[in-house]
Amino acid sequence: MLSVDPEKKRAKANAVDIYVGRRIRQRRRWQNMSQAALGEAIGVTFQQVQKYEKGSNRVGAGRLQQISDALEVHPSYFFEDMPDDTQSIGQGAPNQAYIPPEVIEFAASDEGVELIRAFSRVGNLNVRCRIVKLLKSLGEHDW
């Protein structure tokens, strides 16, 4: 009788799982959807959605398609801009600009999404540049 190696019995999440999870979270938040609402749409609990988003549980192909449908994106969205070197996920790939984890976390927060949405509605390039200068200036002060 063949015995199953306990280490191989349950696949552990890896850097790709973490990256896909982050993309799920970003898209869900961009859509103003709660974890509970996404879970209901795909037939899982909000806790399971949390695990997918953290990368602690792998998302199978069928489930990824359900998530894609619920979030109104093509499944390839979750792999876009993924570093070629999956070991560098979270640290920035050599051919990509490094984005610190705290910036990624802020961008995915309610406040970050609100700021990004508001900024993206500013069409005038000069106004955008002034907003960026203002924010940089405010960020230099120790309030």
From Swiss-Prot:
Residues 35-54 bind DNA. Residues 24-78 form the HTH cro/C1-type domain. CDD domains: HTH_XRE. Keywords: DNA-binding, Plasmid, Transcription, Transcription regulation. It comes from the Bacteria. Transmembrane segments: none annotated. SUPFAM superfamilies: lambda repressor-like DNA-binding domains. The keyword Transcription regulation applies. GO terms for molecular function: DNA binding. It holds the Pfam family HTH_3. This is Uncharacterized HTH-type transcriptional regulator y4aM. It comes from Sinorhizobium fredii (strain NBRC 101917 / NGR234).
